[in-house]
Amino acid sequence: AMHGRTRKQMYMGEADWETLKDVADALTIPFVGNGDVTTPEKAKSMLEDVGADAVMVGRAALGNPWIIKDMVHYLDTGEKLRPQTVEEKVATAKEQLNGLIDLKGEKIAVPEFRRQAAYYLKGIPRSARTRAKINDVWTKQEVFDLLDDFVEKYEARQKQINR
């Protein structure tokens, strides 16, 4: 596996897919390409244009665990799946928190989850306040109440918009 960004670049700039292609072309063993694979189309390009035998997804999966299914479906059919609804995103976030609590206990799980929670809400209009408030909660119930309140307000806004 090789990432198309240097250590010095860290998370800045774009992954160098030309270098990945050069390496993939030179190898006789399977090559896994990584870096800026954020959409099903980019996964396809990594396989077809770069010549990777497989694709590794990193930060694009944070708060978006469906991305792998979306990519596989696109590679198999050429069709994109519908995006997840806000309700589906929040339900999955809650499921993740429940799993973390089962694994580590609430006292450790909630602070750990707070770092992930913002990714589930990223890109949703008017979610900034909720993303910020999540950093101030310490219990599962507080997280669930905050997320439920966000969904309720989001749905109310959507109903007003769609009138």
Predicted segments with their positions:
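Flavin-dependent oxidoreductase catalytic cores
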Residues: A1-R163
